[in-house]
Design a protein with these regions (language model features):
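Alpha-helical scaffold/interaction cores of sigma-54-like transcription cofactors
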Residues: 1-499
Length: 499
């Protein structure tokens, strides 16, 4: 193998990368890559999706991120070990900590203090950044400080050749910098699309990010179609004057052995103490509720007892007592918060602080611990969908909390478990038809009134049907004589599902 791409962006480099993680993985396999790094801007949102897809296709995934420093310059961080992944996540958390500045209504871009990166770099490899905004390009002295912090074996000067004005002069300066620091160079492609067919969409995404048209963001857009995943042989040709920077990518890739799909695991808190194991604590909670809810008046209690013993034995066998106790404890915290927020005299104090849903209602243990409001024995519900010996992962318990207690409950959970053991999980909006019509249409400079009429005609969901919706317009023949209207439908189909 002559080359490994160590700098690639997916659609999780929001409004910049134009390909889904699995598209990058598939293209890498097609081109014969042995490994590929995903380095999205200031996040690892697509890394697990990419890692699974790449491994399935025989490409070794490398985890990383392109991180923005406090001065606006970029460095590329690659993960070498599980410790490195932990440090990368901590650094990204710190970079995002002040993005919601209370003095501004607009979110601020992530920024990482270089001093923090110099302190928390164990298990990470640092490349000096991209051609436009790389740290070594913007501030060679700061790059030198970072090189000293990482050491010669974990800091590389990054060379890129996007075929823009100044390439030769910039790379000559960077090679001189590497020589003066005693570090090696690596070549990267700064990939923003898996294939040249997606370059037009990448231009549109930049326009959307800049809230303008394609003409209004010429300076921000890439000047050509070269920031795509290329054959390794093409990179060797591109860097014919410094082949060592190309070959160094394969040497470095061999060191980056961290596997996101295997090396991370989570174990729920054991809750055991010296006197009572977690399984005994869970039984105690269940027995207390059992005594309150069932009597000896009929045979139902015997059926419930058998079911309880079966579930507790299975939970003990799977080592999940801590899993159930954790959810129960969060629910108890919710009860405390609900009492504080609503007050004992409020009519709302009788409402449950939270309620489970989904397959967990089939569990008697969930019912007895308050995680579900449905008696599965009385309603003849099966446990198998929720919990069985063949489970590939932990079962799923969805707890819905009322809006009036949610904010205080989040604070209470963080206080209870600590900032290192509590996190908010984000979900991302993805493009559907109306959002695609409005954003892509604005980028192409299409008339606002026409876009609004078209948006109102659609079902609001499938952006891949926009071309068909255009063809159904009364003036479709006139519109489709315009190259921009013809491109519009295809671009909406390409942007469909992107975050």
């Amino acid at each position: 193998m002559t080359y490994v791409e160590l700098h690639a962006h997916s659609a999780y480099s929001f409004l910049d990368g134009a390909s889904q993680p699995e598209e990058l993985a598939a293209r890498a396999a097609e081109l014969g890559y042995e490994a590929l790094a995903l380095t999205d801007h200031d996040g690892v949102y697509g890394s697990l999706e990419f890692a699974h897809a790449a491994k399935h296709l025989g490409v070794r995934p490398i985890t990383g991120a392109e991180v923005t420093l406090a001065d606006g310059s970029h460095v590329t961080l690659l993960v070498e070990s599980a410790r490195g992944y932990a440090n990368l996540c901590r650094l990204l958390t710190a970079a995002h900590a002040h993005t919601r500045d209370t003095t501004s209504r607009e979110p601020q871009p992530p920024r990482l203090d270089q001093a923090l990166l110099e302190e928390q770099n164990e298990g990470l490899v640092c490349l000096s950044g991209c051609a436009r905004d790389g740290l070594a390009v913007r501030d060679p002295n700061a790059a030198a400080r970072l090189a000293r912090a990482f050491g010669r074996d974990r800091f590389y000067v990054e060379l890129q050749r996007p075929y823009e004005r100044g390439d030769v002069r910039r790379n000559a300066r960077l090679r001189d910098l590497a020589a003066s620091l005693g570090v090696r160079t690596v070549a990267t492609g700064d990939v923003h699309a898996h294939d040249r067919s997606r370059v037009g969409l990448q231009d549109v995404l930049v326009a959307v990010r800049c809230r303008t048209s394609l003409e209004g963001c010429e300076r921000e857009r890439r000047g050509n179609h070269e920031s795509v995943l290329l054959r390794p042989e093409e990179l060797l040709e591109r860097f014919a004057d410094c082949p060592e920077a190309v070959h160094e990518t394969t040497q470095l890739a061999q060191r980056l052995e961290f596997d996101l799909t295997e090396e991370l695991g989570y174990r729920y808190p054991d809750f055991s103490d010296g006197a009572e194991p977690a399984s005994a604590q869970l039984r105690r909670v269940c027995e207390g509720a059992f005594a309150e809810r069932y009597d000896d008046l009929n045979g139902h209690k015997r059926r419930v007892r058998r079911r309880l013993e079966e579930e507790l034995a299975l939970i003990d066998e799977l080592g999940l007592a801590g899993f159930f106790l954790l959810h129960w404890e969060v629910l108890e915290l919710a009860r405390e918060v609900a009492l504080e927020v609503r007050g004992p005299g409020s009519m709302r104090h009788v409402l449950p602080p939270g309620r489970g849903r989904g397959s967990s209602v089939g569990s008697l243990v969930c019912y007895l611990t308050g995680l579900s409001h449905v008696d599965p024995v009385e309603n003849n519900l099966s446990l198998g969908r929720f919990l069985n010996r063949e489970l590939a992962s932990v079962p799923d318990i969805d707890l819905d909390f009322p809006r009036d207690i949610r904010e205080k409950l989040i604070v209470r959970v963080v206080e209870r478990y600590g900032q290192e053991h509590a996190a908010l999980v984000a979900s991302f909006s993805t493009y559907r038809s109306r959002g695609a019509i409005r954003d892509v249409g604005k980028a192409l400079g299409l008339p606002y009134a026409d876009l609004e009429r078209l948006a109102r005609r659609t079902d609001g969901w499938n952006a891949q049907r926009v071309a068909a919706e255009i063809a159904a317009l009364p003036d479709a023949a006139t519109k489709l004589r315009s190259p921009r209207w013809r491109a519009f439908g295809a671009l909406c189909a390409e942007i469909a599902g992107l975050p």
